[in-house]
């Protein structure tokens, strides 16, 4: 094959299959077609096992050009494809998929779109701003009083949540608290059954006034706790009807449940935490006032003459025994 003077000049190839036989014949003995030798061709690279997958080059897709732009570009044949891409990129697509906004230029408002926010997040932002304004107001009025001068029953953020919730409250919430407490404890039902409607209404009104005072003066803890102690002292007079100090717990739970129902803006867990902190402080004062009144009643239950007589008798006994010795 490498010799040019060789007589094997005619090569016949049948196909490109790997098993095809290449026949070389003599040119002088073409009519006999006797093959001198046969040789199998090598496998092509494409038919061997692929070692790696060669991906075709990616073509960049050019976006369609509006008819108006095509008419403008057809007059100038020297414009390149890159300039067409830049001209197309200067137009924006509308969000609804219509083609009318392709011809409208870009504006600052299109890039400055605000995402829709939930009512809860917007309310939290308003609460944070209100807290900042309240803190600035406290700093101006309180001066250098420190943290204790501006401290209240609950933190500032919870105080604002409570005040916003209680705007929807009605005076009938006191009666609802009493009914809920009676439904949860049999002892409470027994005590209320021994009272007339006017007395029960008076208890509900006192509870509503206490909550209203606590909400309005949440930053004045001493004033609110004084009111709570006075209310707790009135419950000491209900002991003959079967009232016990452990019934303050169902009263507090009923008050929290009724006040949480008033809110529909904040998260339920946040509202529950805020009201729980407030009523925990309130009923601490109510319980303290109850025990103060009970102790006072026990001290004053015996007549003064009986107390002095007992003291004199005890003193005489001790003096006689000491004299005998």
Swiss-Prot record:
GO molecular function: heme binding; oxygen binding
Domain Globin as annotated: residue spans: 153-291
Top-level taxon of the source organism: Eukaryota
Residue numbers spanned by region Disordered: 32-65, 99-152
UniProt name for this protein: Uncharacterized protein B0361.4
Organism: Caenorhabditis elegans
Taxon lineage: Eukaryota, Metazoa, Ecdysozoa, Nematoda, Chromadorea
